Every structure is written in C-alpha cells, then in structure tokens.
C-alpha cells in the first residue's frame, strides 16, 4: 500500500509538470525538418486510388519490439486511410532483421528482386541498408523511427533527402524526459543509459542527454554494448553506479528490456522508458512519442509517393513534435 501511495504522489507530480510545462514545450524538430501537420490525420478523406491499380510494398523492420511494431501498424493504417488497403489494392511483404545488419541488407535485396513499388524501413540501421540497396534502382524508400536522419546520412543538414528517400523521425524529447525524472526523483544525481555502439540513433541521443543533463542537476553514466550478449554484465555494472536509468529507443537494448527491468527491480533502481510500450512492460514512466501516430504520418507520406503526387526525393523528413506522459501505476 505504501508503494502505491508513493507512486500515486509521484505520478500526480509528474502529471502536473506535464500540464504546466511540457504541453507547450514539445520535443525539438531535427534541424531543417518539416513539422507534422496533426490536423491532417483527422480531417483528410481517404485518397483516390485508380481502381485498376495495385501496388506491392516491402516493409523491413530492424527489430521486434513494441514501438517498432506500433510503427508498422500505424504505417498500414495511414496507407489505408489514404485508400491503399492490404488484400485489396495493396500487397505487403514483411520481414524482420532481428537486429542483424547483414540480414537487413538481405531483406532489401529480396524486396528489390521482387520488384516492389516502395520500401518502408523501420528504424535507423535498416533504413541505412534500404538506402544503400535502393539508391540506384528508382525504388523509393520511406523510413520511420529514425532518430537523427542527418547523422544517419539519410538527409542533408537542411532536412532535404540525399536521394529517393524520406520519412519520419522519432527524435526523443530529451529535456522533457529530464524534467520528468527530476520531478519524480528530486534527490537523484546519476542517470544510467545503456546503448548499442553500432546504432547512430543512440549515439545522437546520448550526446543530447549529456549536453542537457547538468541543467537538471544530473550526471549521465553511459554504458555501450556491441551485442545483446553484452547486456547482462553491462546492466549489472551500470546499476551499481546510478540512482536510476532511462532508456532510449535503442533497438538492441529495448529487445532486452525485460532482463534489464528484472535486474533493476531487484536493486530497487527505477527505470524510465522512452515510449508507452516500454512503460507497459515495466518502466516507471516516460515522456515519449506515440509510435502508431508516427507510423500513420509515414503512411500518409508513402501514399503521396505511390499516387505520384510527390517523389520521395522532393520531401523533407518530418517529425512529430508533441510529447506525451505515460505512467506505470502498477
């Protein structure tokens, strides 16, 4: 009962912080990116697709976990709202790389061999593979859940595409997250972050955390891993050094999040997530994005390309700006 009471107080404080400070302090868009037009989702009628036309798309996903699964669900929902429905005028080929870079490349080669009309790449590593494989083929690539398209070399500094590729970014609302952690843990001094050294999306987020942490009275203690096999020992070591942990959208780490949560729970170390699915499986709270909405936004972009209204190479990448608070009351 005491734990639930303390948790309720912490959640109320965090919710108040969100209402007072974060509603107007959205996550920053990556430099040069176009902001999301949230009105479009609710007001735009389904797009017109010629009855005789049918399309085949390939969806390549880097890892199997909640946020990326939600992106895929949202992407297909976004396409359907625009008139492209799986099983009617849309054939969907789906493959998952299970966090393996070599498999990511094979997936893209397979899609191209099957002459897909468009590739959707979910997460940074497989988006890079898609760009490399498709750049001289004329097949457009639409990515989603790419934290920093510029650092990933998928966009120029001004947000314009580097080729026939565009999509959406899941740039983390880092300052909102730090403000939430400070509100919920007023005495905490150190935050641990585990990340994959091979994922540029995580390296970008780590740097942003390190730059902003001191403003909120925190020190960031980082731990890089090269594979899932490194995570158990890395977690044991990191948990000895920190007051809490916060999780990125790092695919390698998120795939092992239940293990990390188990180890942290045994030591009484709170773990914060970066989106709702991480909270659902045990993280204390998160200031994060809605990945279904991110996927829907990406689906709308893909629909424009399939209809021939725009080319991917003409579209700057887009960012959802609004961060939302998710809390675990269990």
Give a label for each model feature.
Residues 18-21:
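C-terminal motif of bacterial Sec signal peptides marking the signal peptidase cleavage site
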Residues 23-26:
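Bacterial signal peptide processing site
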Residues 50-51, 148-190, 289-310:
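Hydrophobic alpha-helical segments within soluble ligand-binding/sensing domains
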Residues 51, 55-82, 93-102, 198-202, ...:
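Extracytoplasmic "Venus flytrap"
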Residues 57, 75, 166-213, 315-330:
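An alpha-beta-alpha
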Residues 97-156, 250-265, 269:
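Beta-alpha junction/loop-to-helix N-cap segments that form part of ligand/metal-binding clefts
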Residues 129, 134-175, 273-285:
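Flexible loop/hinge segments that line or gate small-molecule binding clefts
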Residues 276-327:
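Flexible loop/turn connectors
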């Amino acid at each position: 009962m005491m734990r639930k009471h303390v948790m309720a107080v912490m959640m109320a404080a965090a919710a108040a912080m969100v209402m007072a400070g974060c509603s107007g302090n959205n996550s920053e868009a990556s430099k040069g990116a176009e902001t999301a037009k949230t009105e479009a989702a609710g007001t735009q009628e389904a797009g017109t697709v010629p009855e005789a036309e049918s399309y085949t798309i390939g969806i390549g996903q880097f890892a199997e976990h909640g946020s990326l699964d939600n992106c895929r669900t949202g992407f297909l929902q976004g396409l359907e709202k625009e008139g492209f429905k799986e099983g009617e005028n849309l054939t969907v080929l789906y493959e998952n790389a299970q966090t393996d870079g070599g498999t990511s490349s094979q997936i893209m080669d397979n899609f191209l061999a099957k002459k897909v009309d468009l590739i959707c790449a979910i997460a940074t590593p497989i988006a890079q593979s898609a760009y490399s494989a498709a750049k001289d083929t004329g097949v457009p690539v639409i990515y989603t859940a790419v934290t920093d398209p510029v650092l990933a070399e998928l966009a120029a500094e001004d947000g314009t595409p580097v080729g026939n590729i565009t999509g959406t970014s899941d740039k983390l609302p880092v300052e909102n997250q730090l403000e939430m952690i400070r509100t919920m843990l007023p005495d905490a001094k150190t935050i641990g972050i585990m990340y994959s050294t091979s994922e540029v999306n995580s390296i970008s987020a780590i740097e942003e955390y390190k730059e902003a942490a001191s403003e909120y009275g925190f020190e960031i203690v980082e731990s890089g891993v090269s594979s899932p096999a490194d995570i158990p020992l890395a977690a044991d070591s990191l948990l000895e050094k920190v007051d809490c942990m916060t999780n990125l959208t790092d695919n390698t780490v998120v795939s092992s999040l239940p293990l990390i949560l188990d180890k942290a729970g045994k030591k009484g170390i709170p773990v914060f997530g970066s989106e709702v699915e991480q909270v659902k499986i045990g993280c204390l709270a998160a200031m994060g994005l809605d990945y279904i909405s991110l996927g829907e936004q990406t689906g709308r972009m893909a629909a424009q390309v399939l209809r021939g209204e725009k080319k991917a190479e003409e579209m700057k990448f887009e960012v959802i700006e609004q961060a939302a608070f998710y809390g675990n009351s269990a």
